[in-house]
C-alpha cells in the first residue's frame, strides 16, 4: 500500500498555523496470545483508514495559494515521504516482552521514548513532514501500537478521532474496496475548514492586543537545557469532587460561574508546580499558565466533534507568586489553601466564559488571517501548560476479534518542563459511575523541583497520602 494515494491538496487553516511543526506520539498496548494474526488485521485496518482518508498519507508542504502571504502551508500527496517511512512500520522484538516494555517505572510512567515512535518529535527541514504514521512493535506476548501525528495538522480531539476510526477499520471484515462508515470524510473536513474561514469578522483594537498576548511566540522552548523527568499520578475522584464542592461554596458571589472539576485540578497542579519551582530569584515573579481550549462548539454553526484539524487556542492566565497560608491546627491542606485554589479556579472559569461570546471566534480567525506571515504567529511557550485529554474515551477501545481491546493508553512524555497532561479516563469498567473514575495526570518538571512537589502538603492531600 506504500504507493501514493491521490487527493486534492488543501490549505491548512489559520488555526493550524498557530501550532508549531512537531510530532505527538500516543501508544496503545494489546496483550495477545497470537500477535501474528493481529499484525495482519492491523495492516488491513491502516490500509482501510488511509483509503478512506487518503490525506493521512500526505505531507505538510509550503503553499503558493495565498499571494502576498508568507509561510502558508498545505497538505499535499507525498510519494517521497511514503518511500522514506511507510504508513505502518512493523518491528519485531523477541528478546523482551510487551509487559516489560509498558510497565511503569519508579516515576509511574512507561519509558517510551523516540525509539518506540513512528516519527521523532522534530523532523529535519530537509525531510518531508508526513501527516501521520503508525508503528507496531510486536512482542511474543502482544503489540505496542504507536500513532504519531503532526500537531500542526491535528489537535488532541483529532488524535482521539483518528484512533477511533482506526479501531473501526480494524473491526471491518468487508472487502478492502468496500467503504467503511466513518464519522468524517474528505468532504466533511473541507466543509469544516470553510466554516472556520467564513467565520472571520473584524476585530477591535483591544481584541488584537489580547490576541497578541496569546500568540506572539517567544520561539524559545523553556527549560530544554535542564534535566527533566515526567511522573504519572492518579488523583482519587473523591478528592477532586470535594475540592470542586469546596471551591464552589467559597465563591465570593452566587453570580460567579460554576467551577468544574477540571478547573480545580488545573488550579491545584499550577499552584503546586509553581511552589516547587520557586527559587530565591523567582519567588516574586508572575507565572503564566496556558490551558488549551477546544473551539469546535464555539463556531456558528459549530464544527462536528469529529473534525480532525486544530481548533485549540491557549487560554493564558497570569498567576501571582504563591502565598504561604497561615496554618491552623486541625485544618486540612485543602482548606488551608482554599482561597488561593478558589481564586485561580474562578479566574480560569471566567476566562473560559469569555470564549462563549459570539464574536470571539470570528475576531480570532480574522486576526490570524490578516497576518502577513502565517508562520510568525504561533502559541507562545508559557511556564505551565495543563491540557486535558480526559474526554477522549480511548481506553478499552475495541479493535476487533484479532487485536482485541486497548489495554492501556499513553502519550510521549512532555518535551519541556511545565507540561501537564490530564489523561483519558481509564478503569471505567471497574466503577459504576463515570464520576468515580480517578484523574490520571502526567506531569513534567525539572529534576530540581520534584522533591518539593512530592512533599507539598496539597499534593499529598490530593493523593490521599495524608
Swiss-Prot record:
Organism for this UniProt entry: Penicillium expansum (Blue mold rot fungus)
PANTHER family recorded: FAMILY REGULATORY PROTEIN, PUTATIVE (AFU_ORTHOLOGUE AFUA_3G14730)-RELATED, TRICHOTHECENE 3-O-ACETYLTRANSFERASE
Protein purpose: Communesin N16 acyltransferase; part of the gene cluster that mediates the biosynthesis of communesins, a prominent class of indole alkaloids with great potential as pharmaceuticals. Communesins are biosynthesized by the coupling of tryptamine and aurantioclavine, two building blocks derived from L-tryptophan.
Sequence similarity: Belongs to the fumigaclavine B O-acetyltransferase family.
EC number(s) recorded for this UniProt protein: 2.3.1.-
Enzyme class: transferase
Keywords: Acyltransferase, Transferase
Observed phenotype of the null mutant: Abolishes the biosynthesis of communesins A and B and leads to the accumulation of communesin I, a non-acylated version of communesins A and B.
InterPro entries for this protein: CAT-like_dom_sf (IPR023213), Sec_Metabolite_Acyltrans (IPR051283)
Gene: cnsK
Species classification: Eukaryota, Fungi, Dikarya, Ascomycota, Pezizomycotina
Transferase as UniProt keyword: yes
Coiled-coil blocks: none
Pathway terms, separated by semicolons: Alkaloid biosynthesis
Molecular functions per Gene Ontology: acyltransferase activity
Keyword Transmembrane appears in the UniProt entry: no
Name of the protein this chain belongs to: Communesin N16 acyltransferase cnsK
Pfam family, one: Transferase
Amino acid at each position: 500500500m506504500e504507493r501514493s494515494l491521490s487527493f486534492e491538496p488543501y490549505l491548512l487553516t489559520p488555526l493550524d498555523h498557530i501550532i508549531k511543526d512537531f510530532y505527538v506520539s500516543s501508544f496503545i498496548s494489546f496483550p495477545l496470545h497470537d500477535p501474528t494474526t493481529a499484525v495482519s488485521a492491523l495492516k488491513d485496518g491502516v490500509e482501510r483508514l488511509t483509503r478512506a482518508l487518503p490525506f493521512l498519507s500526505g505531507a505538510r508542504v509550503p503553499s503558493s495559494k495565498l499571494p502576498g502571504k508568507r509561510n502558508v502551508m498545505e497538505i499535499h500527496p507525498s510519494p517521497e515521504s511514503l518511500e522514506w517511512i511507510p504508513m505502518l512500520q512493523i518491528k519485531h522484538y523477541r528478546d523482551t516482552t510487551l509487559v516489560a516494555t509498558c510497565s511503569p517505572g519508579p516515576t509511574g510512567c512507561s519509558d517510551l521514548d523516540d525509539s518506540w515512535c513512528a516519527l521523532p518529535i522534530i523532523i529535519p527541514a530537509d525531510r518531508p513532514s508526513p501527516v501521520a504514521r503508525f508503528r507496531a512493535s510486536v512482542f511474543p506476548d502482544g503489540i505496542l501500537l504507536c500513532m504519531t501525528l503532526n500537531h500542526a495538522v491535528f489537535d488532541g480531539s483529532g488524535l482521539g478521532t483518528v484512533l477511533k476510526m482506526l479501531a473501526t477499520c480494524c473491526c471491518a471484515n468487508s472487502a478492502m474496496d468496500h467503504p467503511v462508515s466513518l464519522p468524517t470524510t474528505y468532504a466533511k473536513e473541507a466543509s469544516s475548514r470553510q466554516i472556520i474561514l467564513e467565520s472571520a469578522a473584524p476585530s477591535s483594537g483591544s481584541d488584537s492586543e489580547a490576541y497578541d498576548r496569546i500568540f506572539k511566540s517567544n520561539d524559545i522552548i523553556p527549560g530544554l537545557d535542564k534535566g527533566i523527568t515526567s511522573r504519572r499520578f492518579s488523583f482519587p475522584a473523591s478528592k477532586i469532587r470535594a475540592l470542586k464542592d469546596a471551591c464552589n461554596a467559597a465563591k465570593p458571589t452566587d453570580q460567579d460561574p460554576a467551577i468544574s472539576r477540571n478547573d480545580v485540578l488545573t488550579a491545584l497542579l499550577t499552584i503546586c508546580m509553581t511552589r516547587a519551582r520557586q527559587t530565591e530569584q523567582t519567588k516574586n515573579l508572575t507565572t503564566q499558565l496556558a490551558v488549551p481550549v477546544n473551539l469546535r462548539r464555539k463556531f456558528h454553526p459549530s464544527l462536528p466533534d469529529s473534525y480532525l484539524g486544530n481548533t485549540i487556542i491557549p487560554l493564558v492566565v497570569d498567576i501571582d507568586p504563591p502565598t504561604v497560608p497561615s496554618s491552623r491546627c486541625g485544618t486540612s491542606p485543602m482548606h488551608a489553601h482554599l482561597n488561593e485554589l478558589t481564586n485561580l479556579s474562578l479566574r480560569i472559569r471566567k476566562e473560559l466564559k469569555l470564549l462563549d461570546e459570539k464574536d470571539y471566534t470570528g475576531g480570532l480567525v480574522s486576526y490570524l488571517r490578516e497576518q502577513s506571515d502565517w508562520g510568525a504567529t504561533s502559541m507562545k511557550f508559557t511556564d505551565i501548560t495543563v491540557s486535558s485529554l480526559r474526554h477522549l474515551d480511548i481506553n478499552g477501545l475495541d479493535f476487533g476479534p484479532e487485536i482485541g481491546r486497548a489495554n492501556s493508553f499513553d502519550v510521549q512524555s512532555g518535551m519541556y518542563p511545565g507540561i501537564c497532561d490530564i489523561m483519558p479516563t481509564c478503569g471505567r469498567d471497574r466503577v459504576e459511575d463515570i464520576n468515580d473514575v480517578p484523574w490520571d495526570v502526567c506531569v513534567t518538571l525539572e529534576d530540581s523541583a520534584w522533591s518539593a512537589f512530592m512533599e507539598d502538603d496539597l499534593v499529598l492531600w490530593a493523593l490521599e497520602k495524608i
